[in-house]
A protein has these predicted regions:
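C-terminal "cap" of GNAT-fold acetyltransferases
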Residues: 119, 132, 138-189
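A short, internal acetyl-CoA/4′-phosphopantetheine-binding micro-motif in the GNAT/acyltransferase core
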Residues: 71-78, 106-108
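Conserved acetyl-CoA-binding loop of GNAT-fold acetyltransferases
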Residues: 122, 127-134
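A structural signal for short, well-ordered beta-strand segments and their strand-loop junctions
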Residues: 46, 100-103, 133-135
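Conserved acetyl-CoA-binding loop-helix of GNAT-fold acetyltransferases
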Residues: 79-95
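Conserved GNAT acetyl-CoA-binding A-motif
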Residues: 94-118
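A conserved beta-strand-loop-helix scaffold within acyl/acetyltransferase catalytic domains
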Residues: 15, 23-75
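Short amphipathic alpha-helix that is part of the acyltransferase structural core
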Residues: 1-30, 165, 172-188
């Protein structure tokens, strides 16, 4: 079950799990996270099974489009199918929206074969659930190169349209866009 959590629990979640689950360059600092949480710029959700919190994610909504960030299964529940059930629940939870966007590290970010394998498995995880990799978008956030994967509830968008949606979402949440570089390989007509 997906449950939206309040500010205090969201801040506790950061300290308890996010710091361990995400490298420093892939998560906001605690100060930035607290500011976003207090200002209601994003929503924090936990995913529970049998009354236990087994996973969590952050979502940001703009014009019926959802960006999912920092999705993670809590370490002791990994390898038990929780991630698949979580992703299916998220897809169902947002079924009245236009699309879901997720960011997955680009294969360029791998420093070794083990990291490359993890990145490939992460992409496959999303694609097996129906997400499509949006090729032709260059997307770098806080110096991390990402691939964009999209689950469409509506007609597929062009790279330019999707790029504009992502810029719009991040502009609302993080108006200082110095650390976001995103562009489409399509020409604006």
């Amino acid at each position: 079950m997906i449950i939206k959590i309040k500010e205090k629990e969201g801040l506790e979640l950061y300290k308890k799990y996010m710091e361990a689950d995400f490298p420093e360059d892939e998560r906001p600092s605690y100060k930035e996270y607290k500011k976003l949480t207090i200002s209601n710029k994003h929503d924090i959700y936990k995913y529970q099974e049998n009354g236990e919190t087994v996973a969590y994610f952050i979502s940001i909504e703009k014009h019926n489009n959802i960006l999912i960030t920092h999705l993670a299964v809590i370490k002791r529940y990994r390898g038990m199918g929780v991630g698949k059930r979580l992703l299916n629940s998220i897809i169902n939870f947002y079924k009245n929206k236009n699309l879901l966007i997720v960011e997955a590290e680009s294969e360029k970010m791998a420093n070794n074969e083990n990291e490359l394998d993890i990145i490939k498995r992460r992409k496959k995880y999303y694609m097996n659930a129906g997400f499509e990799e949006q090729k032709g978008i260059k997307y770098i956030l806080t110096d991390v190169d990402y691939s964009i994967l999209v689950y469409y509830y509506i007609t597929k968008l062009t790279n330019i349209e999707l790029t504009n949606i992502i810029k719009s979402i991040y502009n609302d949440v993080l108006p200082n866009m110095d650390y976001l570089k995103i562009e489409s390989d399509e020409k604006d007509i």
